[in-house]
Amino acid sequence: MRTIYLILTFVCCIIAKAETFPYRSIASFNISPASESHCMILDSEGMMWVGTNSGLKSYDGYTVKSYKSNALSPGILPNNDIRSMAEDHEQNLWLGTRNGLVKINRKTGVFKTYFLPSEDQRIIYHLFVSRDGTLWVGTDGGLSYFNPENESFYTYTSRNAWRIDENGKKQRLNSFSVKCVTEDKNGDLLIGTWSSGLMRLKRGSNVFRSYPKLNDMNSAYSLFFDRNHRLWVGTWGYGVLCISNPDNQKNPQYHQYPYATNNFDIFYKFVEDPTTNTLWACTREGICYLDEDQPQAGWSKYTQIGGNPLIYCNDISTDGAGNIWLCTQNDGVLQITTPPSLFRMPLPSTT
């Protein structure tokens, strides 16, 4: 076999007709009109979990189960409004709610609730498990991590941490609201905030280093490292930008993609599809994708589904095998199966 790379002429048609993208709706996974889906995760065993404002749902491909606090099962969750989820290295599922944190022991089925100490740490916006197994928690009270030995939380504050701004000035860490956390290839943490910009925290350090200002609001709402170690930053109201040299904080090289107010200006999350080498993002106005080998070409957008607006795509996941899962507010859970690369076609050998 030899592989011949062809540019397919129908690519432009697919990009131009966003409403025709191939999808499958999971009929058994309907979300009631009174519920809103906020977040989604595919765990290490292939189970899908969806967090809503009325509890947690799981789907194994056949059966949907619901978990929530009510008269029949009081106290399972401290609050039924689930805002974030993560799976740790012991296969425990962690839920961030509007009032506390929950650990689900997958082996025993036991739910356990934890509360962070401050009032501004009640709503858990983001959960992230780093490669060393640490659970990181993002709240309006800043960045915290969970210590499993004594089941306590350590929070970086003005009493124990510092911040170096983009001009090199060092001062006590001020308050900030954490919206996302990710990890680079060296184990450093990148922290995205509501309006305090993008920061880097070296492991074992208590010094947060700020990147140059991203936009007027200094919003960094979502973060993602692609396979080329470019850092993608989704913002709240300012579209998306790519940082091509994130290791160099003095000259990180920002590339801002065009956007318009209320038109793909809020980016909730990114995933990477290795089968097509594309980057996918969910937004308030729909979903979009970008060819990672041609990032200068821009984002192609899907704004409709079945003739109806595809809005409030709150989360997105991938199994790494060409399946993209969307968690939408109005259309439930949708599956997109990406075809083999749109840009490469293997042909049989003629020799």
What is each of the regions a protein language model found here?
Residues 1-351:
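Carboxylate-rich, polar loop motifs that coordinate divalent cations or form catalytic acidic clusters
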